[in-house]
Amino acid sequence: MPREDRATWKSNYFLKIIQLLDDYPKCFIVGADNVGSKQMQQIRMSLRGKAVVLMGKNTMMRKAIRGHLENNPALEKLLPHIRGNVGFVFTKEDLTEIRDMLLANKVPAAARAGAIAPCEVTVPAQNTGLGPEKTSFFQALGITTKISRGTIEILSDVQLIKTGDKVGASEATLLNMLNISPFSFGLVIQQVFDNGSIYNPEVLDITEETLHSRFLEGVRNVASVCLQIGYPTVASVPHSIINGYKRVLALSVETDYTFPLAEKVKAFLADPSAFVAAAPVAAATTAAPAAAAAPAKVEAKEESEESDEDMGFGLFD
């Protein structure tokens, strides 16, 4: 089958990306640095039926999107984020589920000299199994060691590489000697596009519990501020009413002014013994049903004992 010419290929690519943008309301913009063709094929297979991966040149993706802005102006939000080695993952499924599937397809990778470290690398304290002749190599990297049973032992955990640092030749050699593959590569989500809105992928980690706690915290802050400045809101009005009632009650106690709810408080303040007497009455009211049930249990127990005694006498008659 003859290979299609470049003009036809471009035309088909434009049609494909536009169709995907129309058919799928959600997509990820993903970085594909250090992702090989074999790993990309594995990612496509794992997402089959749930998502579609589309890679391409940035200029072609931007051109296709700009040509479709008249029909879907919200796509303009994607343009500033199409830079570097990026692509799209289109889906109709739950975004968190697809994100987890992408993370599951990351593969461990050895450190290469000159590569930019995507994460911090720490060498744990361990017996390396290397001979004493390598001691100077560890000293050059500032790693404290000792010779234990003829092999080099690292005495404490060592932060070898920081995030964003360029991996040096010595660091890469050491990690390879220790059989440590510190990095993992795969499609990295850079932005999320969801029904016209674009946001950071960290938003996917927000749960309902987080939203609920943040909402309550906001309500408490609003109520506190409104109470201080005397500005009534839905959040502060209940507290304002309670505080107002307390002030009126205090004023009533100190003056001759009274109202039904204040009379009981005044009576207790005038005769504290009445308040003390009221407590046992309430307790007695609560205990009455239990007390009424107790004699019935005692009576039942006595009947049971009498029955047992009768049975005992019957055995020896």
Swiss-Prot record:
CDD domains: Ribosomal_P0_L10e. P0 forms a pentameric complex by interaction with dimers of P1 and P2. Identified in a IGF2BP1-dependent mRNP granule complex containing untranslated mRNAs. Interacts with APEX1. Interacts with FMR1 isoform 6. Keywords: Cytoplasm, Isopeptide bond, Nucleus, Phosphoprotein, Ribonucleoprotein, Ribosomal protein, Ubl conjugation. InterPro entries: Ribosomal_protein_uL10, Ribosomal_uL10, Ribosomal_uL10-like_insert, Ribosomal_uL10-like_insert_sf, Ribosomal_uL10-like_sf, uL10_eukaryotes. Residues 302-311 have a biased composition (Acidic residues). It comes from Homo sapiens. The keyword Hydrolase does not apply. It is found in: Nucleus; Cytoplasm. The keyword Membrane does not apply. One of its GO terms (cellular component) is membrane. One of its GO terms (molecular function) is structural constituent of ribosome. The modification Phosphothreonine is found at residue 59. GO terms for biological process: cytoplasmic translation; ribosome biogenesis; translation. The modification Phosphotyrosine is found at residue 24. Coiled coil: none annotated. Belongs to the universal ribosomal protein uL10 family. There is a cross-link at residue 264 (Glycyl lysine isopeptide (Lys-Gly) (interchain with G-Cter in ubiquitin)). The modification Phosphoserine is found at residues 304, 307. Ribosomal protein P0 is the functional equivalent of E.coli protein L10. There is a cross-link at residue 297 (Glycyl lysine isopeptide (Lys-Gly) (interchain with G-Cter in SUMO1)). Ubiquitinated at Lys-264 by RNF14 and RNF25 in response to ribosome collisions (ribosome stalling). This is Large ribosomal subunit protein uL10. There is a cross-link at residue 297 (Glycyl lysine isopeptide (Lys-Gly) (interchain with G-Cter in SUMO2)). Residues 294-317 are annotated as: Disordered.
